[in-house]
Amino acid sequence: HDDHGHKKKDDHDDHDDHAHGEYDPHIWLDPINAKIILNEMVEHLIENDSKNTSTYKSNLDKALKDIDKLVKDVKAELNQSTSSIVFHDAYQYFEKRFNVNVLGAFTVNTDVMPGAEQLAEIREKIEHDKVSCIFSEPQFNPDIINAVAKDMDIKTGVLDPLGSNLNPGKGLYFDLIRNMSKSFKGC
């Protein structure tokens, strides 16, 4: 994810200061940001296609209500989150919106995999902080996650921040956020 501005960071304890460069590009993982994006999109659509203004506004109103319900449902589902470590440092928007307790990441830059020393530190962190789950992503080989989890009392799960395994369609975004919620909840 070099094109995302990811930089190598050795310490992931402070999740208020993610190492995404100046901006974290994973804005879609907070549904409130999705509402802002939708409002902007509709504004531009209306500017360029004013004859369909009422349709755009009607669709926007429905989408905003659906997002509000999504946020409420996910907050209720994740009301007792356990601690986890994620594959890469991409989830701060989701973490902050839904109070998810992510204690670290295997890598900040997905082009640079962690070495033996960093993996040992992660195993130590898992034991010390009583991390209950570590997550891989479908876009990347889970061997590192499985190697760390081997011989440890820890669950593994999959987070898909891109929705790579979802079918395209009008429910895609909602499925993406719900699936992330289910992954955190189930792990």
Across the structure, where does each feature detected by a protein language model lie?
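Extracytoplasmic metal-acquisition and chelation regions
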Residues: H1-C187
